[in-house]
């Protein structure tokens, strides 16, 4: 299995157990599922009816998105101006990382072009996105984008391809 870590924070953001689809050569999208957390009942073997009904667990059921839950992603908020400021800074760090890892100038330019196109698409539908960060809550790290498919039911996450480093486990 491959785990994908943020190149800035080192946070685990996703794994190849989710079907990653490359978009425009600069991003990955992965469909998610809504899961229910909590609400478990535990049978301790005691006769609860003999002692009253006070022994039930007070667990609340919560619906979460599997990727968000599995990788402990934290919701954060951005207005459009703040997100663009973060994105500009983050793209600069990705380009530096690409250059440091031996990427050619052509590869970096190709990334820049694709990233600009993709970023325009994100900004065009900015209000539809939710923003997530890794558990370290590093303000310089990748912001994972969460949106819903056209059916309005299927959530999916978007991650910057060049901002991830894969580790085999």
From Swiss-Prot:
Pull one GO CC term from this UniProt entry: cytosol
Q: What does this protein do?
A: Involved in protein synthesis. Involved in microtubule stabilization.
Does the entry feature the keyword Endoplasmic reticulum, yes or no? no
**Coiled coil start-end:** none
Top-level lineage group = Eukaryota
Gene3D superfamilies assigned to the protein according to its UniProt record, in alphabetical order: Metal Binding Protein, Guanine Nucleotide Exchange Factor, Chain A (2.170.150.10)
| Compartment annotation | Cytoplasm, Cytoskeleton
Query: What SUPFAM superfamilies does the record point to?
Result: Mss4-like
Residues in TCTP domain copies: 1-169
Q: Which GO terms describe its biological process?
A: cytoplasmic translation; negative regulation of microtubule depolymerization
Which protein family is named in the record? Belongs to the TCTP family.
Asked if the keyword Cytoplasm belongs to this entry, the reply reads: yes
- Protein name listed in UniProt: Translationally-controlled tumor protein homolog
Q: Which UniProt keywords apply?
A: Allergen, Cytoplasm, Cytoskeleton, Microtubule, Protein biosynthesis
**PROSITE patterns per record:** TCTP_3
Record GO terms (molecular function): calcium ion binding
């Amino acid at each position: 299995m491959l785990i994908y870590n943020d190149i800035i924070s080192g946070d685990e953001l996703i794994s190849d157990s989710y079907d990653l689809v490359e978009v425009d050569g600069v991003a990955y999208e992965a469909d998610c599922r809504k899961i229910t957390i909590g609400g478990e009942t535990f049978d301790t073997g005691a006769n609860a009816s003999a002692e009253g009904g006070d022994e039930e667990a007070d667990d609340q059921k919560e619906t979460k998105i599997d990727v968000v839950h599995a990788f402990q992603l934290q919701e954060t908020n951005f207005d459009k101006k703040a997100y663009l400021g973060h994105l500009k800074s983050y793209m600069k760090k990705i380009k530096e990382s690409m250059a440091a890892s031996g990427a050619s100038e052509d590869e970096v330019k190709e990334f820049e072009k694709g990233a600009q196109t993709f970023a325009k698409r994100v900004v065009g539908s900015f209000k539809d996105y939710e923003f997530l960060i890794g558990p370290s809550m590093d303000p310089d790290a990748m912001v994972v984008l969460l949106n819903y498919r056209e059916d309005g039911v299927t959530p999916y996450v978007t991650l910057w391809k060049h901002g991830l480093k894969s580790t085999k486990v």
